[in-house]
Amino acid sequence: MSSPPRGEVAARLEPVVAEAVSAAGFDLEELDVQQAGRRRLVKVVVDAEEGVGLDEISEISRAVSKVLDAHEHVLAGSYTLEVTSPGVDRPLTRPRHWRRARYRLVRVRLADGSDLVVRVGEADDEGVVVLADGEIRTLAYRDVERAVVEVEFQQPPAEDLVRLERAADGAPERGGDRGDTEESR
């Protein structure tokens, strides 16, 4: 009896692995199954709002291992399990990725081919508020071709964070009078 193709194995395992990961309080970002000699390599990438530490990786690894053992017929043999968190260079492809990147610096390639380096603010299911070239603006996800977090070795400027917070709160960009009072809203 031949084993199912790699993509089919991952597709059959994804619902039960996702359930185990979710029950532990994490998001399944990726499930990949590859042949590695006589064994299969099952790579599980997980994330959470607050990030993932080594203790959490161990907990998830035990939970996923139990699920895989219960579904060993799908793997058709022995396997090696690798549980990891996404790297810093993971592309931001889902709204939750943007929410987790709040206040981080992100390199964005727009659909029109232009590139921006932005600081991320409030994100919802349609788009994200960013600080780009000193201006607060909103990017719709549909206009983003690729986005990756930039590594920073120092704290972001406090002024940038304040501006993004004010934008999230709906406050005027500058403290001046723009006719935008509580009564006029």
Swiss-Prot record:
Residues 162-185 are annotated as: Disordered. InterPro entries: Ribosome_maturation_RimP, RimP_C, RimP_N, RimP_N_sf. Belongs to the RimP family. It is found in: Cytoplasm. It holds the Pfam family RimP_N. GO terms for cellular component: cytosol. This is Ribosome maturation factor RimP. Keywords: Cytoplasm, Ribosome biogenesis. Its main location: cytoplasm. Required for maturation of 30S ribosomal subunits. One of its GO terms (biological process) is translation. PANTHER family: RIBOSOME MATURATION FACTOR RIMP. The keyword Cytoplasm applies. Transmembrane segments: none annotated.
